[in-house]
Design a protein with these regions (language model features):
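Glycine/threonine-rich beta-strand-loop-alpha-helix active-site module
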Residues: 13-20, 24-118
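Carboxylate- and glycine-rich phosphate/diphosphate-binding segment that chelates Mg2+/Mn2+
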Residues: 92-167
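Short beta->alpha junction loops
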Residues: 2-12
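Anionic group-transfer/hydrolysis microenvironments
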Residues: 6, 82, 121
């Protein structure tokens, strides 16, 4: 079954619709195919298929409910078709709550993708303009990591190398 209703910046409604679709179709894992938004949404959907309530109930910052999930998320497979966010390598999602105008991060140790299929050939069809946007995204993420107040030597080394590669 294919759920293809993810927005460029996913919102709670995307997540909840995707979770309902997953439940209706008896999904036992979730594949995120596309850019960072698609993969972030897949992680959030994987969280919500086996759990009740609203996605925002499980967000710890802002107006989130701060609840613990009762059930582990479904396994997630990430297949990026763009480069820039690196979301296939982490457990975190970025989802927008349109009611409160908040864009918050969610996830936990169980929302790391169990598999990432990273093939540069998937990125060949991306228009040059979007490839440039993704380069800036990678640069900003790396710079953010480097100047973060909770940084450490290993993170600094990786961030500096990423900045060097992108620059």
């Amino acid at each position: 079954a294919v759920f293809d209703k993810i927005l460029a910046n996913p919102v709670i409604a995307n997540v909840m619709d995707g979770a309902a679709f997953g439940r209706e179709n008896g999904c036992d894992f979730v594949i995120g195919l596309g850019g960072g938004s698609s993969i972030d949404a897949a992680k959030a959907i994987a969280m919500m298929i086996p759990n009740e309530g609203n996605y925002w109930d499980y967000i710890y910052g802002g107006t989130g409910g701060g609840q613990r999930m009762k059930n582990k998320p479904l396994p997630i497979v990430a297949i990026p078709t763009t480069a820039g966010t690196g979301t296939e390598l982490d457990a975190w999602t970025i989802i927008t709550n349109e009611e409160t105008n908040e864009k918050m991060s969610g996830g936990n140790k169980n929302t790391f993708p169990v598999l990432a299929v990273v093939d540069p050939n998937f990125m060949l069809s991306v228009p040059p303009k979007f490839t440039a946007y993704q380069g800036f995204d990678a640069l900003f993420h790396s710079t953010e990591s480097y100047i973060n107040k909770t940084n450490n030597l290993m993170r600094d080394m990786i961030a500096l190398k990423a900045i060097e590669c992108v620059g």
